[in-house]
Amino acid sequence: VPADCDPPRTTHAALAARLGDARLLTLYDQATWSEGPTWWEAQRTLVWSDLVGRRVLGWREDGAVDVLLDATAFTNGNAVDAQQRLVHCEHGRRAITRSARWLPRRWA
């Protein structure tokens, strides 16, 4: 469900100054419970978890959304390490895991 607060509102003066006239944009609305967004510069992809859907998704600048990982152990946090590998916090296993090797699903 798209957020119904455009422009974003806040009572925090410093945040309000930073937001300026920013507008909210819905990039994807097919996730049940989204958490853990991070920007993966090497792939120019916004990565986040669909916790309930048990998958990690990636939004590319052309608007496409790919399933990067499926059947996860309830991944709820993501990061990118110095070698540009994805690192995930897994709620189900109470573990931190890393995607050591990455093969693109599509070639530009």
Roles of regions detected by a PLM:
Residues 1-108:
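Sequence-structural signature of mature extracellular/luminal beta-sheet repeat domains
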